[in-house]
Each structure stands twice: as structure tokens, then as C-alpha cells.
């Protein structure tokens, strides 16, 4: 018996290797025909919604396809994973194989034709294998130009040419030759090909045609001048937020509501631009009312955190800045050089004193310069508020007689209304570009205008002036320090909204910020009514990665946001994400502190608040509540609704069910049923979600560690982050 088994093992297994394209077609045949081949190659779970009604809710599959290969020699089933990677500069092909034993895994094959067999027969005997046919000849496939669209209801791929789209994802490099029928070599390199001097001219041309392959994709042109890629515009200026390079002739394999995924792994966001911006680009002049008052065209976007419209309007064009001139000059110098002009000669205001505080955390966003600015702003705002109470007019003595540039000089005129908050309106302002303006710009712009978002902060008659002053100062200082961070030669984060200036006019304070023309995440989800407020999983993953990078930047510099929600997440049309609204942010560590300050009490919006905030008198780490909020934001993007209204067992039945199910089964049904483009990404994401939604803060993962998990590492993001 032993001898017979050894003989069976030594006998060559003659079987026809099924190509992946054939396996894909077999998915649409009756189930009986799928197991007819000795090797059963199965796509998991690339199925059309029309043929697989049970899995109609699955989202489209993008790049990674797992194949289960039933080998008669080895049992149990071996798992092969073919993963699509983004093409880096200099690589001629973007496809690689990863996973256990990927280098020896079967690849795409086909039978050779009679004409090709004649070429092989003309070769000398020593160039032909005694037991195998010729290795690796294949014709170039014809590539379809159709786009594989997605079902708007469930995101599944449905196209007559979906076989080509899926087959292209599984091909090896076009520069390699694949083995055929049990070859002893995995890949036949060019040096092993038959010499041409043994073939006549006719066969030379035939062999050349048989072994010719489509031209490789042009290498991507990455712009690494900053932390992320840039898109070239006709005027040779660039918006630094584009995921794909121009000129890459690649096929779109997934398209859903403007979001496109290409066969090289890249993707493209196409978020709707504001209607008023399009009108301004066509016009020759700005629609400005007399005396600079706001004309009434409304934006075609929503910034939902800025809720109501106020009746009283104010003239802001003559507003003057509250920032000291020294601060402005230092900021401009830091923007150019990355360091303060007087770093070597500057002395601390408390230097020489016994209680001089030593800087132990140089990366902290709140340092000595910010402390000086806080004191200066607080003093000027207090004086202005006193004048406002007495004369109902903001005219501080420091501003009278100064010939500093006005609001109109720096930021132009109001041209639209964005929304309104608790303390006033938010307006869109624009000014014409001039010769002094040079890229890169820190806000949205086109060939004619530069745009700014202007937030009005006006005290109410019954408001606490001390609280109002603290809110204005903290919101501006935190946003300004994060968006203009140049300490230790580091650049600002691309996912933090720029805050430029704070001014005052006759009746209010004015904060000037970067304008994001695509609105906020809340408006984006509400606008996707056909998809029930859901985003494609790949698009949501990209946004999640950008959000985590922005939050990590804040945490690395001693600040927690504490109010992360879709209303506070803004976008550019090409998918660049910006975190805004630092009014409730917490400074948990300054430049003079080693320890992290804990806090207590409820901060933020209830659906996004972590459960430990509802415990009376309990102190918590503000960084961990940001991580919880990021998880809730992601689930909202995927499901189109909240998991619960409030993370409290006593107040919300949905959260109580989540708590009980996790206690009883150690899993949550909603997380288990979430679909992704393939099982590997779905599993990695599910593991990360369980790490995020831990009601015990000590068990919850941090934002930095979450970015290091396999889910985020395998996520293709349209920004390129500096690894340092």
C-alpha cells in the first residue's frame, strides 16, 4: 500500500488549469457546472446582483480577490490573495501578488493555437521540453472601453464587460510569461526564450505577434513638494488635493455617484461644487451690494453647523485686524522659512525669574508665542466689549488712527451667504487675484478670485462677556496655531482648516478662515438620497484615513477636538478633507507640561459622544473620545444613519442592545453584516471597529495605533502623507 501511494504521488497530474476569466464566467452558470474542473477557482464574492439575489446588498469589489484552490495533493484548501497596489513612480506595472505562497500560485492561462504550435515544432529538440509543451505564449487581449457601473441600491457591479474589468485585476505583469500545464518553472524569463536564428522570417513575425503585450501604464507623476499630491490646472497652479495624475490612461471599473475607482487602484472624488462659485468663474465682476453689504445669492452647498439666518447685517469691509503687527510679520516669516525670525535672540517674558517654566514638550501647539497672542487678544477683546456695552459700538482706542490694511484690502467683498451659527452669520468673501498672489494658496481659488469664509461673532445682550471672550480667543488661537504650525521645521497638516485672521468692525468680531467649496459631510450624506445617505466603502475609507490623520496631528500637538461630527468636516471637490470648528477643543498638554490633563463633563453632540462622558464626576482622556467620535462618523458614512442617539444604556435602547450583544456574544450583528469590496478588507475593518467601540476607555485603541492597523494600511488614500 505504501509503495502504491508513493507511485501515485510521483505520477504527474495532468489537468487543465482554469484561467481566472473562465472561473469568473462560471459564476454565472448553474451551480452544478462549477465543480466540474479538478481545480475549483472561486471569486470571493465577485457576483452580479442579477445572478446572486442573496448577496445583492454587497458593495462592489475593487482590487483584492481571494482565490480558493483545491489541490488534490494538499489539503485543506489553500488561500491565495491577489492584491492590487498603487503604481509607484518607475514601475511599469501596478499589479503584484501577495499572501502565502503567492509567487507559486496559478495565473491566467490559455491553450496555444495551431499556428503557434507550428512555431514551437520548428525549434530544435534541445530547446523543447520532452514532457511539456511550449511555455507562456499568449496573445494580447482586446481591451474594452466600457465602464463597469454600480447598482445605486447596493453598489454591486453590473456590466456586460465586467469579465474584462475583473480579468484585468488578476493579470500578472505583461512583461512576464506564465507557465502552462505543470511547468517546472513558475515564470519563463526573456533570457530563456528560443533564439531567433532558429526561426525563419515568417515565424519571427508570428512569434513577435504572439508574445507582444499591451503597453504598460505610464508611471504616475507624484508631486512630493508638500505632504500630498497636487492637481495641475490650466494656469499652471495646483489645488493640492488630487488623487490621480493627469494623463494616466486607465480604465474605470467602479463608478457610483461621481466616485470612481480605476484599475490601477487609484480613485477619484467628484463632489459637487457650489453653484455660486461656478457663476463667479463665468462673470467678470463680483456681485457686491452698495457699501459692501451682502447680496443675496445663496450657496448650493450646506454647512450644517451654521444653522440659522440672522436679520441684522453688518458692514465688514472696514473691519481692522486684532492681530499685532509683530505677530503678522513673524507669521509671514515662518511661512517662508519654517522658523521664527528672532528664535536665536528672543527671550522669554519670564526669563530670569525663579519660576521660569522650562519647555519640555516642544511639539505642543500652545507655547510661549501663543501665550503672548492669547494675552494680547484677550486684552483687546475685553476693551472692545466694554466699549460695546457703553456705546453699542466697537471702537477700541488702539485701532483709531492706525493705517493698517482693512478687511476689503486683504479679503475682498461678501459675495454669498453660507449659513449662521449661535453668534452670527458665515459669509463667503472673494477678491480679485493680483500680481502679489503666488501659489500655493491656502484657500480655494480659481483663475480670477481667491475665496474666504468669514465667520461673524457677535455678543448677545444677555450673554456672559467673559465666556464670550474666552470662546473667541480659544477658538481662534487653537485653529490659528494648528493651521500655521511651523515649529521644528514641520509643515501644517493638510486636513486642518486654515484660520487666517481675527478682526473687529463696528458691531462684531470677524474670523477669517479657509473656504471649502464642496460643503460638509452632513450635506454630502443628505444629498445622496438615492443611496439612503451611504457612501461607497472605498470612499468612506479614504475619508476616514484623512480624518484620522488630521485628528492625530491635533493629538500630537496637545489638542483634542472634542466635537467631531459630519457638520465639522468640510471638503474640496476632489476629496480633500478639512476639520473645522475648534470652539470646544481641549488643550490637554502645553509646551511646559509632560502629563496629559484629563477632563470631565459632556462635550460635543450626543450621537458622537463617548459613553464615559455620561458618567458623573468621572475624568477621561479627551484623545479617546475623539477616537470614539471618528468611529461613529465612519459608521454614519457607511450606514447613512446613527447606530444610536446617545451612548447611554439608560437613555437609548439601541446602545443597550449593542452593550448586551457584545457582553453575550462578543460581537455585534451590525459590524458582522457590514460588506466591503472583498472579505480581507471587511475582516480588517471589522477588527478595527471592535477596537474603536470599547465602552471602557482603557481598552479603546488610540488614533495613532488605529492608523497602524492593517485596515488603514491597506486603504488607498488620495493624499500622500509624510511618513516622518
From Swiss-Prot:
GO terms for biological process: intracellular monoatomic cation homeostasis. Residues 1-81, 93-188, 318-355 are annotated as: Disordered. SMART domains: S_TKc. It is found in: Cytoplasm. Its EC number is 2.7.11.1. ATP binds at residues 418-426, 455. One of its GO terms (cellular component) is cytosol. The modification Phosphoserine is found at residues 19, 232, 238, 241. InterPro entries: Kinase-like_dom_sf (IPR011009), Prot_kinase_dom (IPR000719), Ser/Thr_kinase_AS (IPR008271). The active site is at residue 563. Residues 412-712 form the Protein kinase domain. This is Probable serine/threonine-protein kinase KKQ8. The keyword Membrane does not apply.
